[in-house]
Every structure is written in structure tokens, then in C-alpha cells.
Amino acid sequence: LIRQYTSSIANYTAAIDRNPSNPFLYINRSTTQSEMIDFISSIDNGYQRIAVDSDPSSRLKTRSDRVYDYDEAIADLNKAAKLLPDFAYIYYNRGNLLCLSGRMPEAIEDYTRAIELNPSFGEAYYNRGLIQIYLKDTRKGCLDMSKAGELGIQQAYKVLKIYGQPGNK
């Protein structure tokens, strides 16, 4: 599979220049940008795993401390949200990128908006629940996990098994 992220992004940029009111061009460019970052991240992580000159604990620490810049992809989703404010997937995708950027409260807001627009959006409940559990709001997180499970997200039950027990926080 040939990954031509740079040329794809350039093509979306040219299309946006010709048609700046098409929200799907911004969504697609954002997706391409985030896929490129994920691909680069996987190469970085793979390189760190095979590096011989560092001990495993420092490689693990380096991997977990690295944050990639999703700001351009988020900016594209901001534009798409202005053009198509009732499309739940924009908020869900932006929530994912905000989470990857460490901006958890903003991610929760976007997942909440996605759920408001599409109350049967199980993945949004699941992701919001994960963040709430991560932020130590286990009660709210478990409520979201329960709803995600009801909506067909089976892995939510595994999370509930761990965090939904009395005394687990």
C-alpha cells in the first residue's frame, strides 16, 4: 500500500481553494492529516522498539511522552463543524483528535455534542466513558460504558467488569 499523504493533503487543499464551502473536503483532509500522523507515530514507535542503544524502560518512557500535533486536523474539523453543525461524526472525530492531543475536557464536550446529535452513537459513549474513567470520574464513566454496551459496543462490558465494581476507582 503506497501512502501518499502529502499529495493527498495537497489535493484536498486545492479542492478546498476551489470550493471552500464543502465540509466534506475539510473532513477528508483532517482524516488524511491524522492518518499521516498515526503512520509517522507507528514508525517512530517501531524504531524505538528496535533501537539497541537504549534500555527498554527509557524506550517505553520516550514513546509515552511523545505527543503529536493534531492542530491542523482539528482546525479542519472546526471549519467543517461551522459548515455542517449537525453532523455528529465531525464532533466524534474531533473528540478523538483532542483526546490524542491530551485535551480531555474538550474531547468530552465533543463526544457529548456527538451524542446530543445522535443518541445511539455507542462509540461516542464509549470514548467519553474512557476519558471520564481516566480523569477519575468512574461513576460517570461507567454510566457511559453501560450505555455503550447497550448500543452494541461489546468491549464496554470488559471495562465495566474492571471499573464497575464497588471500590474500584
Residue locations for each model-derived region?
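Alpha-helical tetratricopeptide repeat
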Residues: 1-169
